[in-house]
C-alpha cells in the first residue's frame, strides 16, 4: 500500500514576505547546483521548487516554462546561461538555491556563484559518469573549500550504473571518500526493468516511489517505506560495511568503537549521521545519493541531504575561521558589522541596475551608507529585495547568511566587498584574510560588431558597457584610429548569446561579424625601461618598469626588491588582466605626497602597465602571461597629479616592450587558446578521429580509455590503486529495453573516450566534422583547460599556450 511520506507545502508566491520573517542564520543553507551540461540541473531544481511548495506544477525545460531558466535564450536553447537564485523552505529551513550553467562558455557564471556558496550539490549523469565540465565545476568548488554532496541522476536510463559512476568519481575527481548512502532498486521484469526507488543505507530501509500510470501518484509524493527485503540484504550489508569502514578511515573514535565488535549495524543512525555531517563540512567525505529527477524518484532525499549534511552560514564560517577566532565571534555573525560580497550585476528593464549580494556578516538595511574598499566611495542602499529567479520582493533588510538584491547602486562591481561607511577607516582589515577573489577568465573568441548607422553607435556603446558590467567575462574594445568595435568572450555561444541580448534586451541596433579566435602575445626575455616625466612645477617623476617572462620563476631582479613571502603572495592570487603585478618599491630616498596612499599609487601604476600591454609588437595582440613591477625615484610635492603615474607607467611599459622587440624580435611569441576536448565514439572510429585530431588539427591526445574502464592518466592510475581498497556498488540493469535504445552509450559496440587538447581555431566548427567522420556516432564536448603549462604562475583556468612556428607561419604568413 502506498502512503504519502513527503507532501508539497502549500506556500505560493503571494506570501513571499514569509521568507524574510525571523529565520535563524542556523536554519539557512546557501547551496549551488553544479554539473556538466544536460546532467539535469534545472530539472532537479524545478522539482525541488515543487516539493518545497514554491510552485504548483513542474517546470519543464523542453516546454520552456521553467522558473529558473527565464531568459528567452535559455528557453529557446534549453540550457542554463545565467545563474539564477531563488529561496524556498524545506523542513522549516530556508534553502537559498543557485542554479548554475553547465556549458563551458559560461564557466564564469559558475565561478562567481561558487564564491558566495556554503555548499554544493554536484549532479552526475549516471549513464555518462564524470564528464569534462563536471571536472571544471568540481575544481571551482573545491578551490574555495565548498562542502559537496553528489546526486547521481538519470538512474532510470539504460546504461546507468552507480558502480561505474563511483569508479569515474575516484578516477576523475579529487574525491577520495565518496560515501554511498543509497543504492538503486529496480523491478524484476525480464524484458523491462524499471527504476523504482532506493535502499537507504543509513536509515536501513527501502523506499519505493509510485511509477504507475496513475497521474495522481507519479508526482513523486506517493512513496512506500519498507524494511530491507531478503533479496537485497546482501547488497545492503556490503554497502553498510563500506560506509562504516570509510567513516572509520576519517574518524579515529569511530574506528576504535568499531574494533570492539566489528559490527556495522551496531551504530545508531544518529551516531553515523553526526560524523557524516562533520566530515562532509570539513571536506573529508562526500555523500553520494542517486535517483531520477525526470521521473520524480528520490528528489526529496537530496533535499534532506542539503539540510542534513551541508553547512549553515555559521558552520561554514566556523570551518574557515582561524584558530584564534573566538566562539563568540562565530556565534554572533548577525551582530557583527556589515560584510557583504557582490557576485553578480544585471540590468533590469524597469528597476535599472540590480546588484546581487551575499551578506556574510551583519545586516544590510535599507537606507544604509555602504562603503566600497576598492573604489573608496560610498553609496546608499535605497531599495533591497529578496530574489526569486526573475522576480523580486522588496524588503527592509538582508540579514547575515542571506542572498538578496540592491537596486540602483553604481559604484560596485562583481567581486566587490561592501562594509559599513562607519567602518571605512578599517577597510584593509576586511580586504585581508579569507576574502577570495572572483577570477575573471581571459576571453578566447573575438568578433566585430557594427552599428547600423552612426546615430546607433552611442546606444550600442552604452549597451556594451552595461553588458560588460553584467558579465565581466564579456569584453569590448574600440580601435582609436578606425573606430572598429570588437567584442570578446569565452566561446562562440557566449558571443552569440551576448549579441542576442544586446539586441533584444538592451535595444542595440547592430550586426555581428564572423567569430574568430582571440590571440595574445608574450615575451620570453626580461625587459626594463625608465621614464622621466615633468610636472607643471618642473618636478621630475622617475618610474622604472620591469617586465619578466611568466616562466622565469627565479628572476634575480625580482628577488632584489621583493621577499619570497611577497612573491608567493602575489603568485597565489594568480594573474589579473594577464599580468602578475608585484607592486612598486621606492628608490633613492623617494618622497611622495602625503595624501597619496600606497594603495592608490599602486592602482594607478597598474592601470598604466595594463594599458601599455594592450598592443604587442608582432601583430598588435594584447600581451599576457608575464610578471611586472616598478620602482619610483622622485621628490614630489603635495600638488602632484595622480594621473601622471598612470601616464608614466604606460609609457615606460610600451618603451620596454618595443625596445626589446627592436633588439630581439625573437623574444616574443604568439599565444593561442587551446581547449580540452572529449570525444566519445565507438571503437571502430577511434583511429580516424585520432588521425584527424593529430594530423590536421595539431592536437595532443592525453588519453584514450574505454567507457566504464579505468583511465590511463597518472591521476587515474593513482585512483586505480585506491579502487583496490574501495567499495564499488555492483551494477544493476537499468530500466529501458536495450533494443529501444538510441543514444551513443547504448550501443552494443565498445565505446571509447578520447581526451585531447586542441587549438581552438581548429575546432570552431568541429561538430559537423566529427559527425561526418563517425557517421553521427560520436559525442563531442569542449571545456576550458583547468591546468596550464606553468601552473605555479599562470592564472587559474588559463587557456593560452604558445603557438608552434609551423602554425604561426600558416596563420600569419
From Swiss-Prot:
This is Ribosome-releasing factor 2, mitochondrial. It comes from the Eukaryota. NCBIfam families: small_GTP. GO terms for cellular component: mitochondrial matrix; mitochondrion. It comes from Schizosaccharomyces pombe (strain 972 / ATCC 24843) (Fission yeast). Coiled coil: none annotated. Pfam families: EF-G_D2, EFG_C, EFG_III, GTP_EFTU. CDD domains: EF-G, EFG_III, mtEFG2_II_like. Mitochondrial GTPase that mediates the disassembly of ribosomes from messenger RNA at the termination of mitochondrial protein biosynthesis. Not involved in the GTP-dependent ribosomal translocation step during translation elongation. InterPro entries: EF-G-like_DII, EFG2, EFG_II, EFG_III, EFG_III/V, EFG_V-like, G_TR_CS, P-loop_NTPase. GO terms for biological process: mitochondrial translation; mitochondrial translational termination; ribosome disassembly. Residues 26-314 form the tr-type G domain. GO terms for molecular function: GTP binding; GTPase activity. Keywords: GTP-binding, Mitochondrion, Nucleotide-binding, Protein biosynthesis, Transit peptide. GTP binds at residues 35-42, 99-103, 153-156. It is found in: Mitochondrion. Belongs to the TRAFAC class translation factor GTPase superfamily. Classic translation factor GTPase family. EF-G/EF-2 subfamily. Gene3D superfamilies: 3.30.70.240, Elongation Factor G (Translational Gtpase), domain 3, P-loop containing nucleotide triphosphate hydrolases, Translation factors.
